[in-house]
Amino acid sequence: GVLQGIGASAGQVQGPVRVLTTLQLSEPIAPGTIIVVPYTDAGWGPILAQAAGLVAEVGGQLSHGAIVAREYQIPAVMNIPEATQQFQDGQMVRIDGRAGTVERLTETAAAGSLS
């Protein structure tokens, strides 16, 4: 399905999701990863620098995450309620930072791992 939020930094990217609810990273963010976060503030800057895209539960075009995403020229979609519960690590999504859409390309993380 496609979720509609607020487009905050233009561009399109598709890739795997990494859900982050805290700034404490257990492992580095892999290249090409789209991060899904509850909110952003100044502390998220170094993490955003590693991300290919951003989805946030709250915020708009003037929120910190949106401004930083534009600086780093990564697509960002804000205001997707409960995004951190709706997505799973490794799930493939496509985000459009102009239209403000987040499209699920796979329903669950690794479709190929069911044996």
Q: Where are each of the predicted segments found?
A:
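Non-catalytic, soluble scaffold/interaction modules
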Residues: G1-S115
